[in-house]
Amino acid sequence: MELSALIFKKYLTLAFPLLLLLNPVLSGQFQNGLSETYHRSSSNRSGIALGGIGAGSVELRKNGQFYNWSIMNNWPVFTGDPLVVRTFPHNSDNDSYLFFLVRYQVEDEMPGLKLLQINDGLSEAALESITYYYPWLSSVEKIEYNGTFPFVNMAFTDCEMPFEIKLQSYSPFIPHDVKNSSLPGIFFNFSIISHSAKPVKVLLVGTLRNLSGYETTDKFFASESYNKQGFKGFSMSSGGMDSTSGSWGQMGLFSDSPNCSYYIGWEHKHPYYEKLLLSQKFEDIDDTENRNKTTGGKKLAHISGNMDQRCFSSLGFDAELNKGDTLNAGITMAWNFPNLYGAQNEKSANPDKDYTLGYSLTKIQGHYYSNYFKSASEVASYMLENKSDLNKKSQYFLDNFYNSNIEPYVLNQINSQLNTLITSSTLTKSGKFAIREGLTPSQPWGPNATIDVSLYGSATTIALFPELQKNMMRIHKNLQSPKGEINHGISSDLEQTLNGTWGVYHRVDLVPNYIQLTLRDFFWTGDQDFLREMWPSVLKGIEYLLSERDADKDMMPDMDGIMCSYDNFPMYGLASYIQSQWLSAMAMTKEAALILNDQKTLKLASEILEKGSVLMEQKLWNGSYYNLSNDYSGKRGIDPGILTDQIIGQWIVHQAGLGYLFPEEHVSRALESIMEYSYIENFGLRNCSWPQYPELFPIHESDLWVDQANTCWSGVELGFAGLLLYEGKTSDALKIIKTVDDRYKKAGLYWDHQEFGGHYYRPLSAWSIINGYLGLGINNGNFTFDPRIEKDNFRLFFSYGNGTARFNIDKSEISVEVLTGSMHIKSLTVPSKYLSHEKPVVYLNGKKVKTKMVLKDDARMFLFNQEICAGNNSVVSIR
C-alpha cells in the first residue's frame, strides 16, 4: 500500500468516532443498517436524442440507458401505435431494446461481464434478476458523462474491470446539409484501454432487439447477415405482416472494425449467455429461424406465455490486450421504416383498444431519407463509407460554435436547445418539414409548426436549415383560408391543404406572425423566388386583418379577450404584444414592397406603420413601459400589465436589420422596467407583472384556468435575453440566461425544456442570443453588425441563410470569416467605434476591395457586391 494511503487509513481510524459524535445521521439509530445518500443530480430525466432530423430518434441518458424511441414511426412523435411490446405487466423490457456490455478475462482468472449502464429495475441486458440467474454480469460502478449536442461522451469504470471504456455516440448534424443531418442512424465509437499487468481478453458486445412490427403478433422474425463491402453486421425485419404498415422496416447494427463477429436471433439466456460466458468471440451464428414456429401451416414468431415475442441480435469485437493497449470498435446502428403516415384529427374511439389517439391515418408521406436509401443496410453502408467526413463536419460545426469568447454557459444553453430539432421534427419524403409544439413520452402537445411559437423557435431553423424553414412556411401558405386567415398549426399530415389544420382559430396574432416569419426568411436568405411565391399570401393576410380583425377601423388589430399566444391572458383593444408585431410586420412589408416595386402595398404599409407608431406611443406608453393593453375605443380601459414580450416586434426587426420601431430611449426604459418588475433572482423572468401585485398576480381569484403570468417560459426568457443583447444590456441578459441554465440543470431536464409539454419548440429562440451579441441584422445581402460589448478582442460564430461564419474584432480591425457555404454581401455596416481610421479600407483575403462608404449615425456602411465562399478566399476585413 502506498504511503499516502496508509496515512489516510490511520487518519480515518482515529477520526471516525469523532465524526459519529458530530454527525447525528451517522450516530445513534442510524449507525446500524445501510446508509446511502441520493442526490437530485442522480436522477435521469433527459438526454441527447440520437437520430436524424425527421428520421426518429433514441434518447441516451447519463445512466447509459436508451429512452423515448421513435424510429418505428411510433407515437407520440409520429402516427403509429405507441411503442408497447407485448410482455408481462410491469416487466421493464424496454430497458433492453439496445444495450452494450463487455466480457473480459484476465490471464489465469475467471471471466467477468459488465453492463455499460446503470439500471433502476430488475430487467438488465434482456435478463431479469441477474444477481441470481447470471451472477457473472453486473452494471458498471461509475459513468462519467458529457453531453454537447450532437455528441454524447461517456467513460465507464469499475474497480473490478482492468480497463477503462470510453464511448462517443452521435448522429451527424451539419448546418445547411439536410441530407446528412436527417440520416436514420447513430455512430457508437468505443475505445477500451487496458490497465492490467497481465494480458486480458476482451469481447465488446452491442445488442439490439428486433422491434419491427412491434404492435402486432401476426408476423415472423427475419434477419440478414452482412459480410461484404468492407463491413459486417446484421439487419432485422419481420415477414408475414402488412408491408404498408408504419412499423414495417428494418433495423440493425453494422461495423467496419476488425475482429467483428455476430450472434443473430437469440431470445433466452440459454444458450446465448452460457456461450458468452465461455467464449472469446461469437461464431457468426444466425438462429433467427428458431425464434419462429409453424402452426396450422402459418409461420409466426414464437409467443411466450406472456404473449411476448423476443428476438435479439448481437455484434461483438474481440481482442487480447496488454497493459496500455487499446481496442477501438465502432458500431453503427441504422434503420429504415419508410411508411410514415400522415394523420388527421378525429376524436372517434377505437373499439379494439381501451384508448384512442384522436386521429385517423391518411396516406404515406414517407421520410426524407427514403429519397436516398431503401434499406437499413444501405443506410449503414453510406454512413460507414462516409464516417470520416460526417464526423469531421459535425465536429467542425461544434468546434467553431464553441470557439467564441463569451460565457460557456451561454453557449451550452444555446447548444442544448438543438436537441429539439431531433426529438420533435417531421421531414417527409417530399421535403415538408415541421416541429411539434410540445412532446412528452405519452403524447404530443399541440399541433406541428404552431405559427405563434414559430415566431420564437424558428430563429434556429432559419439560421441552420433555411430550406426547411421556408418549406414549413410554404405549408402554412397552403393552409391559408380563402379570405386570408392564417391557421394556428399543422396536423400530422404535412401534405394536406386547408383541411389539414389543427388547433385554435381566430387568434389575432396569427397573421402578423406569418408575415414576420415569411419576410424574415426572405431577408435572411435573399431568395427572391421565395418572396414572389409567398407575396400574394402576405397581401391576403393584410387584407383579412384589416377587414375582419379591426373593429374600430383604425387599421390596427383589436383584441377582445384571450386571442393570442398567451392563451390564458385576456387583452382588450390595442395590446402592446399584438401592436408591436403588427408594426414589425408592416415595416418588413414596406421593405419587401420596395424590392418588388409594389407601390400600392408600399403606400398601405407606410400608412399603417406611421399611424400605428403614433397609437403605440399615445395609447400604450406610460413613461416607463408599454401597457399590456388599452381599450380606448371600448369600455375596458387600460391594463397596466408589464408583459415581457411587449415589444417583441423590435426583436424581430432587429434580426432583419430594419432599425428601431419605437424610440430607442423607450425601448431601453421598457426593458429596464421589465427586469425591475418581473425578474426574480434564482427563479426566472415572469411573463407578466402588475404594479399593484409586485409579488404574485392573484390567479386564484380569477377564472383563468392556468397561471401564465407568474410563471416563466424559457422560450420567452431566452428570446428576451437576445433583445437585451441587441440593446447592449449584457449584464441583464446574462442574469436571465444563467437563471434558465441553472433552473433546468436543477430539474434534471437540461435537454427537455417544458411549457405546453416537453421538448418545447419556443426555447429554440435561444439562437437569437448569438444574433443579439453581434447586433446582427440580415436584409437581402445587407449585413449589419452592431455588437454592444466592451471588449477589444471579440469573436463569435454565427449562422445565416447560406452558410456559417465567424465575426472577429481585434482592436481596430473587424473581420468576417466564412467557414462553410457562401456569403453574398451587398453591404456591410459596422460601428465606427471599432475603426480607428477616418477612411477605413475593406480587404478580401488581404487585397483591397473597391467600395463606397456611407456614414450612418455611429456606423459606417460599406457598399460592395461580393460573393465570398468558404475556403482559401474567405475573409473580409475592415481596417
Identify the residue ranges that each predicted region occupies.
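Gly/Pro-rich turn-and-neighbor structural signature
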Residues: 29-45, 129-133, 139-145, 151-162, ...
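Substrate-binding groove/exosite segments of carbohydrate-active enzymes
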Residues: 36-81, 292-320, 325, 329-340, ...
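Non-catalytic C-terminal accessory modules of carbohydrate-active enzymes
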Residues: 67, 75-77, 86, 91-97, ...
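Helix-terminus loop motifs that line ligand-binding clefts
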Residues: 72, 76-79, 83-155, 467-565, ...
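Polysaccharide-binding surfaces and accessory modules of carbohydrate-active proteins
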Residues: 172-290, 315, 346-392, 836-853, ...
